[in-house]
Amino acid sequence: MTKSDLKNGTAAYVGPLDKSATKVTIPATVKIDGVTFKVTSIEKNAFKNNKKVKTVTIGKNVSKIGAKAFYGCSKLKTLKIKTTKLTAKKIGSKAFSKTPKSMKVTIPKKKFKTYKSMLIKRGVNKKAKFKKS
């Protein structure tokens, strides 16, 4: 589910429509009423305390992840990040806190070191398995 900004041609992911979904892909773009929008952000609390989701893929246009976006996602086993547009200031506080220690995180090769450090600072456990895509 998204909210959109017609003027900028962007959309924000606010959370899954199907609260029981175990696999979620946040797309690079969405089409609303025939208009294509780039999905550039994941809103704060988008998946907060979601106990069902196991796999999340973040699309290539996402440049912002809100505070506590994935907080308390206790079943999240796989996180695939396709975007190279994230910065430390654009990942909100505790965005990944209280996620499993055994989570597998796939990061774009050219951003591996930077993203790994940023994600740990925002709550991904140091024991998570990080790999390059």
Model-identified regions with their sequence ranges:
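Consensus positions within tandem repeat domains that build extended binding/scaffold surfaces
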Residues: 43-46, 66-69, 93-95
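Short beta-strand/loop segment at the start of cytosolic alpha/beta domains
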Residues: 1-17
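Short, aromatic/basic amphipathic alpha-helical patches
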Residues: 92-95, 113-127
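Intrinsically disordered, low-complexity repeat and linker tracts
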Residues: 1, 13, 125-133
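Short, surface-exposed, low-complexity cationic segments
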Residues: 11, 23-24, 45
